[in-house]
Curated annotation (Swiss-Prot):
PROSITE patterns: HSP70_1 (PS00297), HSP70_2 (PS00329), HSP70_3 (PS01036)
Pfam families: HSP70 (PF00012)
Keywords: ATP-binding, Chaperone, Nucleotide-binding
Protein name according to UniProt: Chaperone protein HscA
Free-text function comment from the UniProt entry: Chaperone involved in the maturation of iron-sulfur cluster-containing proteins. Has a low intrinsic ATPase activity which is markedly stimulated by HscB. Involved in the maturation of IscU.
Database matches in PANTHER family: HEAT SHOCK PROTEIN 70KDA
Length: 616
């Protein structure tokens, strides 16, 4: 008689051997939660069968609502209805007010300048609001899986910086979730498509969601997902389509008052509905604030064309970073609800010369990929051979003498990664070293972004260059950076975990990369000049000390020649001619060679003083 394996509907046939894990797509406009059941990834629906959860929270003095119930309150109570909070994550209040001047809810500044949202439930930061959304998703998963989650994978835009990633982890912690890891959204999509289709080669992941745009160029080979390059815009998405269309409707309807939050919410709702209708129809009817009219797809396309073009410029930069052409890309994966817009699909297809892939629901594909990864990380697939390699978007390094940046980890290096370099002291008797962590592609500190500063103290007093300090940069799988500095002879060390107080401004990453290309030649010249000035300062300081201690070894004429050479070097170092400084250094070296030899002879003579030849 055959034996049958019996399991509860929707549950594993070996429930006691499996751990419960979920993938969460914490989106700007909508969020989802997914899991793997019976070997198949699936998104989880609410009691009404709805898979998407609006990323909206409505606060009252007695409590709060999340999702559809909260969104329903937006028109009547916009001040206390928080949406698109993902855009506020990791940003300063000043940055938010400059970027989003028409937010309906009230913002206040905390003591450290970070934003707090004024609600009937009190002053809440974006981390707390995100935590409330995560709680709703976690509860949906617990009900569907009939148990508590052992771990989750949460997706974030590839361009989220350290502060934004840390804020996401903090929100999960507030929600009572154990984060197995953060996963870049495009990489999650690659996991979903890679496992389903088993393709190998170069793939572009075009992710246009509600509030962010990411483009990633990946190489898929034998289960290995390697991100060759990333790009995008952390403040561009379907919400911007809605705002442009809402402003257009406002003009057509002749609504001049911009202070009425209720009217603004009605306009946005009407714009969103029209955008959805125009994905399938050529004309959408609009009825808002007593005005009736129509919007054509052609009019909508004209409004959003500049934004779509911006995404394609990011695609071009990412391909260049990856060292591939558009013709090398085998498939283009479309992710995010905004990729349903016909103009987006059309322009992306034209750019890459192929029809984009949309076989997996673009709203669900990221959550599905996260669920697959969570299932592996929680230990349900110990035999999995899939390897995931993310990259850092901008180079990481240190400030060195002369205002130069020494890159320790170049951009597009796969993570997790650890790199170390050794540095020495610049001055005699130096007992401390300031460590200035930098991010960017340029050669000079003034052109890069400061991430953090700390000081290594307790360095033994030695001559310049005598102490050796090993600085280690470590980026974990979530993209968070730890920097440790250690003096090798004593083992004394200091470290810092980089958690910037707020994120990069709009387009800053893209402009930093572009500037490094545009100013490459000038940067090389500037670095050469700075290096020569640092070397000149080192030579002059060393000679000043030598002359003070051993100047008696020189005749008056020899001293005058050295003084003259040093004066010429000082004059050259004050200028901006690297070649002139280099020549002056060589001249000074030539004039001091005999002096150096005499100092060496004198040192040997003093060392042998009082000893016989036999003792030597």
């Amino acid at each position: 008689m055959a034996l049958l394996q019996i399991s509860e509907p929707g549950m594993s046939s070996a429930p006691h051997q499996r751990r419960l894990a979920a993938g969460i797509d914490l989106g700007t406009t909508h969020s989802l939660v997914a899991t793997v059941r019976s070997g198949q990834p699936e998104t989880l629906a609410d009691h009404q069968g709805r898979h998407l959860l609006p990323s909206v929270v409505h606060y009252q003095a007695q409590g709060y609502n999340v999702g559809y119930d909260a969104r329903a309150q937006a028109a009547d109570d916009p001040v206390n209805t928080i949406s698109s909070v993902k855009r506020l994550m990791g940003r300063s209040l000043a940055d938010i007010q400059a970027r989003y001047p028409h937010l309906p809810y009230q913002l206040r500044a905390s003591e450290n300048g970070l934003p707090m949202i004024d609600t009937p439930a009190g002053l809440l930061n974006p981390v707390r609001v995100s935590a409330d959304i995560l709680k709703a998703l976690a509860e949906r998963a617990r009900e569907a899986l009939a148990g508590d989650l052992d771990g989750v994978v949460i997706t974030v835009p590839a361009y989220f910086d350290d502060a934004q990633r840390q804020g996401t982890k903090d929100a999960a912690r507030l929600a009572g979730l154990h984060v197995l890891r953060l996963l870049n959204e495009p990489t999650a999509a690659a996991i979903a498509y890679g496992l389903d289709s088993g393709q190998e080669g170069v793939i572009a992941v075009y992710d246009l969601g509600g509030g962010t745009f990411d483009i990633s160029v990946l190489r898929l080979s034998r289960g290995v997902f390697e991100v060759l390059a990333t790009g995008g815009d952390s403040a561009l998405g379907g919400d911007d389509f809605d705002h442009l269309l809402a402003d257009y409707i406002r003009e057509q309807a002749g609504i001049a008052d911009r202070s009425d939050n209720r009217i603004q919410r009605q306009l946005l709702d009407a714009a969103t509905q029209a955008k959805i209708e125009l994905s399938d129809a050529d004309v959408a009817q609009v009825n808002v604030a007593g005005w009736q009219g129509s919007i054509t797809r052609e009019q909508f396309n004209e409004l959003i064309a500049p934004l779509v073009k911006r995404t394609l410029l990011s695609c071009r930069r990412a391909l260049k970073d990856a060292g591939v052409e558009a013709s090398d890309v085998l498939e283009v994966v479309m992710v995010g609800g905004s990729t349903r817009v016909p103009l987006v699909r059309e322009r992306v297809g034209e750019f890459f010369g192929r029809t984009p892939l949309t076989s997996i629901d673009p709203d669900r594909v990221v959550a599905i990929g996260a669920a697959i990864q969570a299932d592996i990380l929680v230990g349900n697939k110990p035999d999995s051979e899939m390897l995931l390699l993310d990259v850092i978007p901008l180079s990481l390094g240190l400030e060195t003498m002369g205002g130069l940046v020494e890159k320790v980890i170049p951009r597009n290096t796969t993570i997790p990664v650890a790199r170390a370099q050794e540095f020495t002291t610049f001055k005699d008797g130096q007992t401390a070293m300031a460590i200035h962590v930098m991010q960017g592609e340029r050669e000079l500190v003034q052109d890069c972004r400061s991430l953090a500063r700390f000081t290594l103290r307790g360095i033994p007093a030695m001559p310049a260059g005598g102490a050796h300090i090993r600085v280690t940069f470590q980026v974990d799988a979530d993209g968070l950076l730890s920097v440790t500095a250690m003096e090798k002879s004593t083992g004394v060390e200091a470290s810092i975990q980089v958690k910037p107080s707020y994120g990069l401004t709009d387009g800053e990453i893209a402009s930093m990369i572009q500037d490094s290309m545009s100013f490459a030649e000038q940067d090389v010249q500037a670095r050469m000049l700075a290096e020569q000035k640092v070397e000149a300062a080192r030579v002059l300081e060393s000679l000043d000390g030598a002359l003070k201690s051993d100047g008696a070894l020189l005749s008056a004429a020899e001293r005058a020649a050295i003084d003259d050479a040093m004066a010429q070097l000082r004059a050259a170092a004050e200028g901006n001619d690297a070649s002139a400084i280099e020549d002056a250094i060589k001249n000074t070296d030539k004039q001091t060679q005999e002096f150096a030899a005499r100092r060496m002879d004198e040192s040997i003579r003093q060392a042998l003083k009082g000893h016989s030849v036999d003792e030597v």
